Amino acid sequence: MKYYASRLLPFYVSVAVVVGVLIGSFYATHFSGNRISFINTSSNKLSDLLHIIDERYVDTVNMADLVERSMPQILKELDPHSTYISAKDVEASMQDLRGSFSGIGVQFTIYDDTVRVVRVIPGGPAEDVGLRPGDRIVAIDGKTYVGKKIDTEGTMKRLKGEAGSKVELTVRRSGVAGMEKYSIVRGDVPVHSVDASYMLDATTGYIRISSWGDNTYGDFLAAMASLSAKGMQHLVIDLRGNLGGYLQAAVSVANEFLPKDRLIVYTKGRRFNQEKYKSNGRGTYQRLPLVILVDETSASASEIFAGAMQDNDRATIIGRRTFGKGLVQVPIEFRDGSMVRLTVARYYTPSGRCVQKPFTPGDEEDYEADLLTRAATGEYYNSDSIKTTGQKYKTRLGRIVYGGGGIIPDFFVPRDTTGITSYYKEVYMSGMMTQFAYWYADHNRKLLGTLKTPEVLAAHLRRTNIVEQFAEYADKHGVQRRNLMIRTSRSLLERMLTTYVVADLFDPAAALQVDNVGDPFIRKALNVFKEGRAFPTLGEKKTACTVLDFIPSVYSAEYGLQTKFALGATRPTSRPGQYRKA
């Protein structure tokens, strides 16, 4: 009995701590201006327990630390998306959605115990002073900063800072004798959620949206204006890997494609009246043929946009069933700068469906395993494996759609695991390919710099057998070469390595453009436009695409964050070995 009670003590303490902390006048404001207030509990029993622990426990207890550790425990008993963010992590969690962060404006990696500049972000302070890709940072503010003890978190802490503050960098540059010193005034570094926009062919525009943030709508309009000037008559919006963001950003973009008074989304919760978001009829692209690309990592605000277009029969959805997040969070800030993002409502698509997939409160492990379960049941490979047991709803034309587990696309594109071997998994998950790409780009920067376009660079890499060079590099760095597996994975390895090197020498947008060549999602989209099927019609059946895509996607979203009275995402994700910004 004593053992059982001792096992439950952490839970009781968690409850006591959180309730004790929440009692009072904490509030937040959602985008419509309504305030949320916590109601004082009529019972002080749990807060009394916390006081007793503080006063009488056998050992001294760090109560602040106990609060920090307890709050996530109690919140996960509610739902998978109510979360606690410590004060030190709040700024980072908001960075990509705010549209900018304060720092020097570089993308870096740590290689051979040295901080290396991979990319200088356009419009940032580092660009103004002349920092270049390939530069080695060997000292920060006069203190040597090299060796095995340096890490990513420490580097970001030293390079980021308040706008207007200074940081002194000592840099070693290839081909230059001695060291160079730079005094950089930190400033606002732009963060764009429209990763790429270009013409797929003479009449088809392509836009990749990686998240829904403060700048998304403005970036989207700028991209659309540019594509329109180039003769765009059809549009592909790529939301693969887009984990979500602000509801208003998704609503604003959806408004551009809908006639007046079309419902886009509505929210409803126990303490919130139903709130509807409708189009205002001033959208510029109401008749533009539209295809939306989604996959299992398209979530939240991405599902709002795709759901609004599908329910209004405004676009054709291509890909795989989306993540299935239909919960709305509101941020509640504490005096110490920390934050709770609490689920306060559900959102519903125009047909009335909630796309939130089922979950068991407190069973976070099962919820997070859902995507693996989909793979195990064959859902990624066969559209017939998609469960459609949820409630049926109808679009404006009367097409059947389903609630309770994401957006099911109109055309299914399966995965192909042909090139996936244990060797490929090892070099991918270890970050070895990213490491090699930096090494290769850095050691061949002068030669590769003469190749003026991403397409020319990609062709050069294929001619020079980059896969063999990578296999030799990996073997020297701890991954034993396995020739049969390398042959099996050759096409996939070549694709990934080419994309990484292009990203290092040009930028992620150029890499995405190279990676999209031959993409089965895009081939299907072009066929839909060619066949005049971008606007869905009644009686059209969902079909599988006969071509296959590779996995994993090279540029999946790096961040997905729950923020504002809007939408969260799933969990933050990143590709192994990814570079960081500062």
Spell out what each predicted region is.
Residues M1-L8:
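Short, Lys/Arg-rich N-terminal segment immediately upstream of the first membrane anchor
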Residues K2, F26-S42, L46, L50-D54, ...:
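Cleft-lining beta-strand/loop regions that shape enzyme active-site pockets
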Residues P10-Y27:
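Hydrophobic membrane-insertion alpha-helices, especially the h-region
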Residues Y57-I121, G164-A196, D515-L526, R533-A544:
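Extended, small/polar residue-biased N-terminal targeting/export presequences
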Residues G134-R136:
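Structural motif
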Residues A301, D313, R320, G324-Q391:
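Polar, glycine-rich mid-to-C-terminal structural blocks
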Residues C354-V355, F359-Q562, G568, R575:
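Conserved functional hotspot residues or short segments at active or partner-binding sites
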Residues L567, Y579-A582:
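Short, solvent-exposed mixed-charge patches
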